Amino acid sequence: MPQLNPEPWLTTFLIVWISLIVILQPKIASLMLTSSPTPYKAMTIKTWPWPWT
């Protein structure tokens, strides 16, 4: 099998990575936007009892 590309895994990885970014970017952005307030709420809830404990 003649190896046309010296690193075929790299190009494959890049193609898969770019396609994943393009496909998942809206989902990731919406997930980050929807789930970003909840960790802050959890953090504030967790950090509130600290002075009393």
UniProtKB/Swiss-Prot annotation:
GO terms for cellular component: mitochondrial membrane; proton-transporting ATP synthase complex. The chain crosses the membrane at residues 8-24. GO terms for biological process: proton motive force-driven ATP synthesis. It is a single-pass membrane protein. It comes from the Eukaryota. Its main location: mitochondrion. InterPro entries: ATP8_metazoa, ATPase_protein_8. Pfam families: ATP-synt_8 (PF00895). GO terms for molecular function: proton transmembrane transporter activity. Keywords: ATP synthesis, CF(0), Hydrogen ion transport, Ion transport, Membrane, Mitochondrion, Transmembrane, Transmembrane helix, Transport. It is found in: Mitochondrion membrane. Belongs to the ATPase protein 8 family. Component of the ATP synthase complex composed at least of ATP5F1A/subunit alpha, ATP5F1B/subunit beta, ATP5MC1/subunit c (homooctomer), MT-ATP6/subunit a, MT-ATP8/subunit 8, ATP5ME/subunit e, ATP5MF/subunit f, ATP5MG/subunit g, ATP5MK/subunit k, ATP5MJ/subunit j, ATP5F1C/subunit gamma, ATP5F1D/subunit delta, ATP5F1E/subunit epsilon, ATP5PF/subunit F6, ATP5PB/subunit b, ATP5PD/subunit d, ATP5PO/subunit OSCP. Subunit 8, of the mitochondrial membrane ATP synthase complex (F(1)F(0) ATP synthase or Complex V) that produces ATP from ADP in the presence of a proton gradient across the membrane which is generated by electron transport complexes of the respiratory chain. ATP synthase complex consist of a soluble F(1) head domain - the catalytic core - and a membrane F(1) domain - the membrane proton channel. These two domains are linked by a central stalk rotating inside the F(1) region and a stationary peripheral stalk. This is ATP synthase F(0) complex subunit 8. It comes from Alligator mississippiensis (American alligator).
